[in-house]
Amino acid sequence: MNIELLQQLCEASAVSGDEQEVRDILINTLEPCVNEITFDGLGSFVARKGNKGPKVAVVGHMDEVGFMVTHIDESGFLRFTTIGGWWNQSMLNHRVTIRTHKGFKIPGVIGSVAPHALTEKQKQQPLSFDEMFIDIGANSREEAEKRGVEIGDFISPEANFACWGEDKVVGKALDNRIGCAMMAELLQTVNNPEITLYGVGSVEEEVGLRGAQTSAEHIKPDVMIVLDTAVAGDVPGIDNIKYPLKLGQGPGLMLFDKRYFPNQKLVAVLKNCAAHNDLPLQFSTMKTGATDGGRYNVMGGGRPVVALCLPTRYLHANSGMISKADYDALLTLIRDFLTTLTAEKVNAFSQFRQVD
């Protein structure tokens, strides 16, 4: 694990629709070791390594969940709307960063009423999104605007990046900066002259998998590996039958989500790779969400796709948690798969006539 790269990516502010900071990091990281960097019309990052053989894409979405400024009141408080999926109880009194249209960063906090000022009835009622506000310490609308805040500015969560103990990493936007970091590490280390390897940082995944569709049309890959996160069910309050993934027990192979089924031959090959390398592998399903695989698998008449996810605690909140061991196991698994891939193997993924 390149922990320095992951920290740099997690600390970037890159809400859906405003992914430039992550895009810049990927450009600076990968430009020295790839043949070409291009972008689709929405801004998805596409790096190409090699120029012969089947096109194999490794995809991690760049965007994170966040907010957008929708109103500045007379007292300088900001009203906002959510971008991506949020639970209102995970938001109050958390720090945020407003990224202005000119690229300046302004700190803020989602305000909350002190318990002393709440009635017993109010204490039992969750605050709705519409009642929340962000305090940037401004005394008036004029002061907020003078600092550069405008309607339409993007807002990202704010949290410290840290390593806890020997194995855990805690930070914001692990969904899905881990996919971006791993994609970059694979582009740096995999050298297979039999394939053309693409690294994709897709945009706007959290609001409808949009960059997956546009980047798929841009590349027209022959096989795709989607890297993402998935709910870890190893904490109190989560149904661990519906959400069986556990930190430290290996990466998860997504058997289906709301928009995708994996190519079963691709699944079999990855299972064999894991067994051959003595790597742990878990399995999960997701009925209420989707990964970029849901757009890639229906591109151009259909393509073989598989989504591999890191178990992650506290998704879509200020601070998530992953296991270094899970990350390293997934990196080893995909590196082995990509290094041994040939045109014959890629073609076999799409052969559906049974042979006696």
Residue spans of the language-model regions?
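N-terminal hydrophobic/helix-forming segments and targeting peptides
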Residues: M1-D356
